[in-house]
Amino acid sequence: MVVYDLLVSLSKESIDVLRFIETNLAAFNQQYIFFNIQRKNSIMTPLLITPQQEKISQIVEFLMDEYNKSNRRPGPPREQPMQAYPLLSYQQSSEEQPMMPYQQPPGDDDQPYEQIYHKKHASQQVNTELSDYYQHILALGDEDKGMDSMLKLPERAKRESDDEDDMFPIKKLTT
């Protein structure tokens, strides 16, 4: 019984510890991704960082530096990342005309005329194809009724292989 209580208390504590680690790992990963994106995109503008994020970023940088120091492999030094350059804003010349978004002509319908027309046309086409198909099937059924009375299997023509079959007669088993 004592062991059971001990296990229950340990499991509760371990769940709390795991939850704490999980929340901190999520914050750690978010901050790490945030800084990697900032470095890769060479963003020069200052970003709003809360004090908690700043502490996490300091911890992340310290851990990454320690990891890099302990796992450095001998060899030529790595290339330094390119220096960041601020992005220049796009200047539109006076000759260029600004692109206007497409505006639908005023009307009562929510859908353009072509879409409505194509939908109706397609449904009519499918209906006519289906009715033609069913008419064809019914016609085939009528033909089959007439054909059954006239249809007779042709007599089996004698082949060269029939002679070979006669050479090895099959005996019928009688019981």
Swiss-Prot record:
Keywords on record: Late protein, Virion
Cellular component aspect of the GO annotation: virion component
Keyword tRNA-binding among record annotations: no
Induction summary: Expressed in the late phase of the viral replicative cycle.
Record region (Disordered): 68-111, 154-175
Annotated compartments: Virion
Parts forming coiled coils: none
Comp. bias (Low complexity): 95-106
Disulfide cysteine pairs (residue numbers): none
Signal peptide range: none
The family this protein is said to belong to: Belongs to the asfivirus H171R family.
Protein's UniProt name: Uncharacterized protein H171R
Phylogenetic classification of the source organism: Viruses, Varidnaviria, Bamfordvirae, Nucleocytoviricota, Pokkesviricetes
